[in-house]
């Protein structure tokens, strides 16, 4: 589990440090979602937040418990959604950058430093940033962003499951599982599928 030890030395000179992460780069369907989270200076996690970790390591139930606690404890937070149509138009990397920047721009207060999960970022606002590979398993603020992005995306995919029941989006959330690929083979793609993501198994090029 994570503490704010990464942020602590940064808070000596900065009052607002913001973690950024995304969910949904790899699925065949649905949006990519990014979140930005900034905690109060010298914040120390207590209670349920002591269980925070990379969202991929947490159960869905624990993520659902953590999300409201993150929102309540954060000084500022925002989530941005970029749908499949835009992903197809500008590609998944550009769509991910767009979602991350939209999340930052939506924050109630402007950060002084961005801590971004991964190895690349293209900022829109003139804010210093640091990319951190596997940051969601190293940095508290990034892990918090990963949970907010993941829970929001999961909510959207569950809603899409009701709209497009043939695909089981509430089970695989758009990822290329055997069941999902079989559903595409049987029914074709629906409106939220990413047309630019091809399936070689189905002979798509």
Curated annotation (Swiss-Prot):
UniProt-listed Pfam families: RNase_HII
One GO MF term: RNA binding
Cofactor(s) needed: Mn(2+); Mg(2+)
Cell location: Cytoplasm
Known catalytic reactions: Endonucleolytic cleavage to 5'-phosphomonoester
Keyword Nucleotide-binding: no
Top EC class, one word: hydrolase
Keywords assigned by UniProt, alphabetized: Cytoplasm, Endonuclease, Hydrolase, Manganese, Metal-binding, Nuclease
Co-factor: note: Manganese or magnesium. Binds 1 divalent metal ion per monomer in the absence of substrate. May bind a second metal ion after substrate binding.
GO cellular component: cytoplasm; ribonuclease H2 complex
GO biological processes: DNA replication, removal of RNA primer; mismatch repair
EC number per UniProt: 3.1.26.4
Source superkingdom: Bacteria
UniProt entry tagged with the keyword Cytoplasm: yes
Residues that hold a divalent metal cation according to the record: 21-22, 117
Entry similarity comment: Belongs to the RNase HII family.
UniProt protein name: Ribonuclease HII
Organism of origin: Chlorobaculum parvum (strain DSM 263 / NCIMB 8327)
Name of encoding gene: rnhB
